[in-house]
Amino acid sequence: MTATVSHAGPQVVILTGVSGSGKSTALRALEDAGFYCVDNLPIVFLEKLLELSGHTAGEVSRMALVVDAREGRFLVEAPRVIRELRQKGADVEVLFLDASDEALVRRYSETRRRHPLAGEGGTVPDGIAAERLALADVRGIADEVIDTTTLNVHELKRLVTRRFVAGDGAKLGVTLVSFGFRFGIPTHADLVLDVRFLPNPFFVPELKPHPGTDPRVAEFVLGQADAKAFLERLVDLLGFLLPRYRNEGKSYLTIAIGCTGGKHRSVALAAALAERLEGSGQPVRLWHRDVEKE
């Protein structure tokens, strides 16, 4: 397994599915896990939201939004928008929640709510049928479909949390973010590390134009004795911390590694740390926040 590097922005989870299937419960689970959550944002505005998140000092590394029948005429645009974002390198996953018609009718009966697509004088089964038809194309591009017919609220929350936060469900989900202090410290970071003590490739003419992902820059940074010592001590520290965080019920950890501009030193160190952690079996997400900024 290799680290996920996304210059396009944060991890995005799109929650969709039929009304009454548990989307609100799933969204609350992700919000509790640290996701920035948006309910009922027209899908056509998603790219703009991701663009804006990349121009603030407090970007989030995880975002979730609900796309459902309330989208109205925008709903037909959802498959196209999602495909285009993926083609541009965005980390977008689609989770579709479903349930049997009988379970949905029962849930509507218990809450005494009208189905949003039932129409004037229509029945809940009529609304369910209309909604399934409207969501067919979105369901077709889903990365995963979860049937919530037999799940209670707590079981669904645990399932969603394990799916999107804790990786394989047994290990702490770790996100590594490289950044530049010039652009602000990531506000959602649990641990912040400053690597500005290392020699800066910015002052080496042949290295200055290239990011820390370039092998020449990485070799320059990681070849320093202090960088090697720092990395070894950091791996040891995390080997001590991660299982203890997990035992305390923490399901995710965001580690931010910063240098001056977020282009060279922090990028090389974050990538090296991700490789070391994944080599030990620890799931890692890697995001170079500022590598393309000037």
Curated annotation (Swiss-Prot):
UniProt keyword list: ATP-binding, GTP-binding, Nucleotide-binding
Residues that bind GTP: D68, A69, R70, E71
Coiled-coil segments on the chain, per record: none
SUPFAM superfamilies: P-loop containing nucleoside triphosphate hydrolases
Binding locations of ATP: G17, V18, S19, G20, S21, G22, K23, S24
Signal peptide residues on this chain, from the entry's feature table: none
GO terms assigned for molecular function: ATP binding; ATP hydrolysis activity; GTP binding
Gene3D superfamilies: P-loop containing nucleotide triphosphate hydrolases
InterPro entries according to UniProt: AAA+_ATPase (IPR003593), P-loop_NTPase (IPR027417), RapZ-like (IPR005337), RapZ-like_N (IPR053930), RapZ_C (IPR053931)
Biological function: Displays ATPase and GTPase activities.
HAMAP family documented for this protein: RapZ_like
Record family assignment: Belongs to the RapZ-like family.
Name under which the protein is recorded: Nucleotide-binding protein Adeh_0147
